[in-house]
């Protein structure tokens, strides 16, 4: 055959897939949850959110995530393409759910353009939140997300984070995580 040079570095080809699998193999086996139907997400918090929301929907007799779907954290948007390339040659049903912010837009569009995943299989939180930019956390009601962060940080009642506080702290973004981060940066060092 000889060496072939291609401008499409992310195309899937059996001859190029094996070295990628070998290179990523160790890292992936350390944190991988893979199944025939797989949702690739950015991080472990996304796995927890999707599992908790699915269980809550199931308890309410509503449509929930089919248990045949496995949720796999990839370690960030930058690694989703590698994971998708790695698994695409294995006849797996793969979809991805990722954040969609200013720094993510070009990466998401590049992932869609590579066609590693079938059309319609690259989903963003913005596809479901109704906001132009979103993280998976934006799928929660802002009151619930603020209460979760308040509880996780062990903040006293007078320091509880509210959606109003969050919006005031970062009015230039609609992303709840960025807003709550701004509130947290303004908390006194001795907080809670």
Identify the function of each model-found stretch.
Residues 99-191:
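Activity-critical C-terminal alpha-helical subdomain
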Residues 1-103:
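RecA-like P-loop NTPase motor core
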């Amino acid at each position: 055959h000889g060496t072939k040079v291609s401008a499409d570095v992310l195309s899937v080809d059996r001859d190029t897939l094996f070295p990628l699998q070998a290179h990523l193999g160790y890292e992936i086996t350390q944190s991988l949850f893979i199944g025939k139907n797989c949702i690739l997400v950015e991080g472990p918090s996304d796995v927890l959110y999707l599992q908790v929301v699915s269980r809550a929907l199931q308890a309410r007799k509503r449509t929930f995530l089919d248990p045949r779907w496995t949720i796999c954290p990839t370690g960030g948007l930058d690694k989703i393409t590698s994971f998708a390339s790695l698994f695409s040659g294995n006849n797996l049903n793969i979809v991805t759910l990722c954040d969609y912010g200013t720094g993510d837009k070009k990466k998401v569009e590049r992932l869609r353009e590579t066609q590693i995943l079938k059309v319609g299989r690259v989903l963003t939180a913005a596809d479901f939140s109704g906001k132009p930019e979103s993280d998976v956390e934006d799928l929660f009601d802002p009151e619930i997300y603020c209460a979760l962060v308040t509880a996780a940080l062990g903040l006293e009642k007078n320091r509880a984070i509210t959606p109003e506080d969050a919006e005031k702290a970062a009015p230039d973004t609609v992303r709840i995580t960025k807003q709550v981060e701004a509130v947290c940066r303004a908390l006194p060092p001795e907080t809670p």
